[in-house]
Amino acid sequence: MSLELLSKLETKIQATLETIELLKMELEEEKQKASTLSEQNQQLTEQNQQLQQELASWNDKVTGLVGLLNSEI
């Protein structure tokens, strides 16, 4: 191989290595975003469950009050 071909090959290899490093950094960023989104999803799921329980409790209270009103009428 000529020196020119070796130089071109070296340049391409270096560019490929740089691309790989950039992709690794992007992958790490995406993993962090996914982790954050997963935590937020878990928090929202828990909050949703709590709100559903509160709603059910209020519905029971309202149903009880309506029942009391109907029995007094």
Swiss-Prot record:
GO cellular component: a single term: cytoplasm
Segments forming a coiled coil: 3-67
GO biological process, one term: FtsZ-dependent cytokinesis
Pfam families: ZapB (PF06005)
Function per UniProt: Non-essential, abundant cell division factor that is required for proper Z-ring formation. It is recruited early to the divisome by direct interaction with FtsZ, stimulating Z-ring assembly and thereby promoting cell division earlier in the cell cycle. Its recruitment to the Z-ring requires functional FtsA or ZipA.
Subunit composition and interactions: Homodimer. The ends of the coiled-coil dimer bind to each other, forming polymers. Interacts with FtsZ.
Protein name from the UniProt record: Cell division protein ZapB
Lineage: Bacteria, Pseudomonadati, Pseudomonadota, Gammaproteobacteria, Alteromonadales
Name of the encoding gene: zapB
